[in-house]
Amino acid sequence: MARTLTALGESFPLATPFRISRGVKTAADVVTVTLSEGGVIGRGECVPYPRYGESVESSIIEIEAIREALESGIDRRVLIDMLPAGAARNAVDCALWDLELRLSGSDIATAMGLA
């Protein structure tokens, strides 16, 4: 079945600025990944950190670079070799977990042997 990918950047203003010693954050800049297959949707997200050389834009570029593989049906085990550890891989990994479990009718607790 055909799978489709959407990767979008979103910015959510914080009600109160978050202050720490190295700066102030006034919004949560998030990348949201949606994978859909056969009417079933899996979602994942990440918050890229400039401290680690990440941005919303760079994360989306990393995700778009593997669009063909994602849409052709790779699973999360293959993803580990396709993207380096970081925000982009986290968002895609979460979307793949969510999609896999929804397609199988299972849940994370059962998949992890906790239920």
Task: Enumerate the language-model features and the residues they cover.
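N-terminal capping/lid subdomain adjacent to the active-site entrance of alpha/beta enzymes
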Residues: M1-A115
